[in-house]
Amino acid sequence: MNLWTKIFQPPCHIKEISDPELVKKQYKYWRMRIFYSMFLGYVFFYFTRKSFTFAMPTLIADLGFDKAQLGIIGSTLYITYGISKFVSGVMSDQSNPRYFMAIGLIITGISNIFFGLSSTIPLFVLFWGINGWFQGWGWPPCARLLTHWYSKSERGTWWSVWSTSHNIGGALIPVLTGVAIDYTGWRGAMFIPGIICIIMGFILIDRLRDTPQSLGLPAIEKFRKEEDAHPHEETTADILEEEAERELSTKEILFTYVLSNKWLWFLSFASFFIYVVRMAVNDWSALYLIETKDYSTVKANLCVSLFEIGGLFGMLLAGWLSDTISKGKRGPMNVVFSLGLLVSILGLWGTRDYFVWWIDGTFLFIIGFFLFGPQMMIGLAAAELSHKKAAGTASGFTGWFAYFGAAFAGYPLGKVAQDWGWHGFFVALLACALIALILFLPTWNASEQSLRKHSH
């Protein structure tokens, strides 16, 4: 047995606990423990992912870099992260998330520290690329855990609550880096998140576990007595339990449940354009406000924090509405929220002649509200429209496209802003939001049942 297998192989299923009351008690305990652990873990992944973003204005001042050079560094992370998200999705579906997520977080912390020790573009690109690769180890194990510990009828709500970790991390890191820059300079803004994440990685090793069956608990569908079938599966509890025992081969995951799935292709291309908008607003809006409205770094970063906070509320509402109003279908909410995103971007650009920070902050809050709804539900829909044992790969596949979109928000949009000004920048964002809306329309009625009919 090689070292990789020894560390990452999923633990074997053990004999199921026979006492129903003990099963209920254990399920309640482990669901909460695993949830808060992966929630906090992903908050800290954001610390090491976005530290550079909020150090950018200081890097321009201290080292004399221009927007295009900084865009290259940013795009490097998004490219390596996007590729890793797909590759790591395949790996994580056959790995123990306890170690997979934790080791990824530890290495991102180390990468941030080495970035802070560097001063040249080649070294920045190297360490930020390594960081991007191991950032891809954060999301797929969470998708695996969410599909194994939470059932179909509740998953939209739990997934949306977990997804607020993006926003909490995104809202905290501008404050942390802003304070760190004021007291220690931009290097301290890289060191501090890095050290915190190394510590958190070891905490995840202690807190996380794999599937319910590895702890002697029944599959979630059997426990909740739901016919929570995935495409190509029967819906009886016995078959579901038997299926839960069987790990899929890499070939089955890729070719049977992911690459031949038409809904994943619509979701993936939509994800590309949603992420262009998301990362453009996240990475460039502070610089836009500083350059065009002469806001202080703290005030501009506060506006970006409002973008993240708006996203938190948007995700929670989108997940709840898709569970209740849409009866588990994610397509309708994706369409409605994308339309709201298009209108809110127009609103922010319409305030360009008003130098009032709370107006800009309000529009960024609204953009975040409408953007993070579909951003969250793309991954959820991908996991649900695939196989339970392919959830990490399916969501990683959409994530692969997403972070190519994010890479487009780096150098290409930086070049647009440099050559055509902020007007060209906003035109590009509006075009991306419109294309995403069009791509969501065919998925309005997408469901496991419609995929089953298509595939048989």
From Swiss-Prot:
One of its GO terms (molecular function) is glucose 6-phosphate:phosphate antiporter activity. Its main location: membrane. GO terms for cellular component: plasma membrane. Gene3D superfamilies: MFS general substrate transporter like domains (1.20.1250.20). The chain crosses the membrane at residues 34-54, 70-90, 113-133, 161-181, 185-205, 257-277, 302-322, 331-351, 363-383, 394-414, 421-441. It is a multi-pass membrane protein. PROSITE patterns: GLPT, MFS. InterPro entries: MFS, MFS_dom, MFS_trans_sf, OPA_Antiporter, Sugar-P_transporter_CS, Sugar_P_transporter. It is found in: Cell membrane. One of its GO terms (biological process) is glucose-6-phosphate transport. Keywords: Cell membrane, Membrane, Sugar transport, Transmembrane, Transmembrane helix, Transport. Transport protein for sugar phosphate uptake. Belongs to the major facilitator superfamily. Organophosphate:Pi antiporter (OPA) (TC 2.A.1.4) family. This is Probable hexose phosphate transport protein. It comes from Chlamydia trachomatis serovar D (strain ATCC VR-885 / DSM 19411 / UW-3/Cx).
